[in-house]
Amino acid sequence: QRQMCIRDRDKLIDYLQSMPDNITYSISGDLKHIAKFDKLVDFLNQYNSSKKIICNYINFAIPASVCKNIFLYKIHIHFPIDIKQLIITTQSLKDQNNLFELIFDIASLDDYLKAWEIIEEYQIDKYQFNPIYTGYNIDFFKENVFLKKSDILSTSMSIKDFFIKQMINNNDFGKINIMPNGDVHSNINYPALGNICTHSIFELIQKEIEEGKSWLRVRNQEPCNACIYQWLCPSPSDYEIMIGQTNLCHVNIHNPNCENL
């Protein structure tokens, strides 16, 4: 998966031509500031791969009918919400018959309740709740995001998935992020692997496999490495990085039948 946000469209297109065909493209940011967007869309339209546009409902703009039915729009909504602007955004997408999904960025229980009111009032069908860590809402995360033993044990998992989690990070593996200056990150929370102006995609992949911290980040650190549920839990996410804690759960590793609530 490639998430793109870069100023030089021609350089980006040249770079993308060196990549495999069967990948997902995600364009993230303010579409009004993307130069030669039509040219980029024309290039992406040559491929049958999945394509997404990720943007905020405030700075949302459908660049042209050239995008119609090509992209899945993932529209982020943060609080407080400008209802008038939200209606304009969703109506614009509906008018062009574009597929879209609303993502509510939730930082508190109050945000969650307000989001539900909007979903029910405006009969929104496709939506997600995206917990946002602010640095000040750890209690909200402990109550609503951290896993309990029952959460871990109730998750279905194949033998294949069990072993995959011991080798790679399911959240990050295979993803790169191309920034406006051309820097390439496997995860934007870690230093850049290189730049599209100076490194080939193959060099960047090799560097991530050999030296990177993202694709192969698994639960092999304390306290997870001493927990009997080590490989049953989801792969580490960005939340662990932002919060500065390797385990986002209530499991007591010294007594798995008890929980740290």
Indicate where each model-derived feature is located.
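Short, small-residue-biased leader/transition segments that mark boundaries at the very start
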Residues: R2-I6
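General structural signal for secondary-structure boundaries
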Residues: R7-R9, K84, V145-S150
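Radical SAM/AdoMet-radical enzyme domain recognition
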Residues: K11-P131
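Generic structural signal for short, solvent-exposed loop/turn connectors between secondary structure elements
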Residues: N56-K68, I132-K149, N189-T198, E208-G212, ...
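Low-complexity, flexible helical/coil segments
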Residues: T89, Y112, Y136-E143, E211-L216, ...
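A C-terminal junction/extension of Radical SAM enzymes
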Residues: A115-Y190, L232
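Flexible mid-to-C-terminal extensions adjoining Fe-S/redox cofactors in radical SAM and related proteins
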Residues: L193-L261
